[in-house]
């Protein structure tokens, strides 16, 4: 992965979980990592580790991507960017009846509008240099919705639709667009999404290792890879859903209602 050595890679949601792992892998390969998240204390810790273990170049830019007015300010502070990894996001698993409009707005602000705003912020420079890569972390939930994930699935459907259209718009510009569609990953995501722990327990055997997911994402940088779909068996399920939606909804609905 020496192809990313010296490249400036902006990672949102970098204070833990998948974003943190991606930052370490990129730094280990000599990339100049630019980290954003709300938790400045965690960003400081991650920067210290990168500096000590890999003598890596790392800068931190605290940011809540749900606050769209702050994105342009941080973008100006960062300077040039070769790769944007839109990783920031969260979910709340509730029924449609029990979910709130505040939850809906918060999820769309971060998962969708924040992602779009960060992308728009880097595009002019990438177009000028005729090279770049935008990697959007979506989800298998963006391909197949399940009970209690209506709002979260809606945000990830939006990310996939946006990314697919953007990829076509940027054809021939030298800018790649990749979406990452993982199933459940063993991270802090479920401390918010699934406070009772029932869903994590129910899908435990399908849980992905964040280090493995991060490795696949990092390896895809500056390739024309359209999508990364994980795990393979769950991705096969989404393809089956496209062919037999009623059957899959009946079977999956029963199993996944335990969120």
Swiss-Prot record:
The active site is at residue 152. Its EC number is 1.-.-.-. Keywords: Oxidoreductase. One of its GO terms (cellular component) is membrane. Substrate binds at residue 139. One of its GO terms (molecular function) is oxidoreductase activity. It comes from the Bacteria. It holds the Pfam family adh_short. NADP(+) binds at residues 11-35. PANTHER family: DEHYDROGENASE/REDUCTASE SDR FAMILY MEMBER 7B, DEHYDROGENASE_REDUCTASE SDR FAMILY MEMBER 7B. Belongs to the short-chain dehydrogenases/reductases (SDR) family. This is Uncharacterized oxidoreductase YqjQ. It comes from Bacillus subtilis (strain 168). The lineage of its organism: Bacteria, Bacillati, Bacillota, Bacilli, Bacillales. The gene is yqjQ.
